[in-house]
Amino acid sequence: MFSLTRHTTPCPEPINGQILQMVVDNLTDISSVALPPSNLLYNIYQYAIGFEVHLYLEALSGEKGIAVELVVATDAQDPEQVIGFLLCLPVKDDPEACGIPFMAVQAGSRRHGVGRAMMQDVLARYPHAELACSVEKVPAFEAMGFQVRGARDTQVLMNTRSYGTDGLMGVLDVAAIYRSLEVQQIHTYLLQRHGKRAMVDAERQRDRHLDELARKVQAFVTGERG
């Protein structure tokens, strides 16, 4: 059993810490880059996605000028233990709409309805929701009421309706994270540890991987419409 809590203000630090750990542990699953751990650049993307979610959690304070809500699932037996979370970005000028940039459930708590319950909680307030996911996750989101709308780079764009919202949704500047000093330091460390050739190979592998994902998504979406 589990409990759901909706947060519209900053969470206690222990909750944030568990959410960020879940994000880092599930990079391949929830990132649009979906790099495997075998790629040498994995640590860079781990840091970047963790920092991105950290910024969204900070934005619950209202100080970043974007609307953010958070649904947290905790173990009913141990309320301090986070087993899932869903980040929701309400849309300005459209009270029924939201975007869902991140959602994850602890590996040991999957297939117990946690993800579905968090999604139902959000859809009860924002029935017009949009998200992007991997091809493999499409059936799970279809079961929650989403439909395929198209391709967004390396992911399938899904919506609970056949059209997107006309309202504005505040998002963070992710590109700035990759230009940050911290990311440069991680890259320098990896370069010193593995050498330039290995890092160039890792970048080529990443680029091929992203091209393959984009082709896979495009083929899937074309097939769906066919």
Where are these regions (language model features)?
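Short loop segments at secondary-structure junctions
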Residues: A76-Q77, G108, R161-G164
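Soluble or luminal CAZymes and related metallo-dependent hydrolases
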Residues: C11, I15, Y45-E52, R110, ...
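Beta-hairpin (beta-strand-turn-beta-strand) motif
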Residues: M103, G108, S134-E136
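Short active-site oxyanion
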Residues: R125-A129
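A structural signal for short, well-ordered beta-strand segments and their strand-loop junctions
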Residues: G99, E130-C133
